[in-house]
């Protein structure tokens, strides 16, 4: 526990942090990667270049300083980050490295004096221990469960299939032929790739797109403009190639009784965790209403269309609505899609305000914000909305 004097000192630095903004974390990351370049094998350097990770860390530091007297308010964020950390195989000793560079950054940018540095050192130590303990629990659970493992495990690509103009799916089986760990629908895999064309090892996380079967995993990857890993997987990876995976992780997953109505709402490649949820609902013989709402650019970018329709038909109360932002001439209204333009939900208010319905959202942040605002305006309680951001977390 932190004493009141330490808490007061940390809180007194909040205005300075807010004024500095993400320049603080830019300095931190530049310093850390200069002194500990081996950490480039863990961090997504694309997120460093576009500033997303720097912004996310800055927001996390400010949130911690603001809530330092109420750590319970941070527990959802701690769980989300701990799940990501364990997929990256973060170890306890790496927290010491991060802490050293954080304090050095504060000193180099602000020269706040030893009392402030000592207070932040204590505060960081408390938070680091929270993460270390939670991550240790996750590691033990992952390793000891049926089919589980620690670290990474080699898998073979047994099927590679183009699902749309921008999305390709990969089915992966363990090279040792042994069982693999089950997962919650909506969770993701971390894939570790080393290639001669890469400056560093690259780790990416991709949602699982099927229900657990104990034998294989399936992910789907969107080709990103200038994406290092997505470009490699689309253009270079072949069936028979070996990749290394961490066990499934993630705090965004379907967890409702079979009599609870659910809406699965996605934009673009955000449908991938929803697809895993849909297959699981079928596997569980879900009896309540299931709404599938999806927005795509057009028919060429719309993936898994037949699979979704066939899976939905096996559910007793399934309905779906598809939006194409800019339909092509070959896209058939009423068959390929039902609405054009953005996902406007007013016409579906009767279906969406079903009592006790839960809503799962995934897609671009602006898409999820747009949808969430509409749902909240309908009077839907915020606690019934669940969402996942691909990449560094942002508030919807």
Curated annotation (Swiss-Prot):
Query: Which positions fall inside the FAD-binding FR-type domain?
Result: 150-255
Binding-site list for FAD: 188, 204-207, 389-392
Q: Which residues form the Globin domain?
A: 1-136
Which key words tag this protein in UniProt?
Answer: Detoxification, FAD, Flavoprotein, Heme, Iron, Metal-binding, NAD, NADP, Oxidoreductase, Oxygen transport, Transport
**Function as written in the Swiss-Prot or TrEMBL entry:** Is involved in NO detoxification in an aerobic process, termed nitric oxide dioxygenase (NOD) reaction that utilizes O(2) and NAD(P)H to convert NO to nitrate, which protects the bacterium from various noxious nitrogen compounds. Therefore, plays a central role in the inducible response to nitrosative stress.
Q: Which PANTHER family does the protein's record reference?
A: FLAVOHEMOPROTEIN
Q: What is this protein called?
A: Flavohemoprotein
Source organism of the structure:
Pectobacterium atrosepticum (strain SCRI 1043 / ATCC BAA-672)
Task: Quote the gene name from the UniProt entry.
Answer: hmp
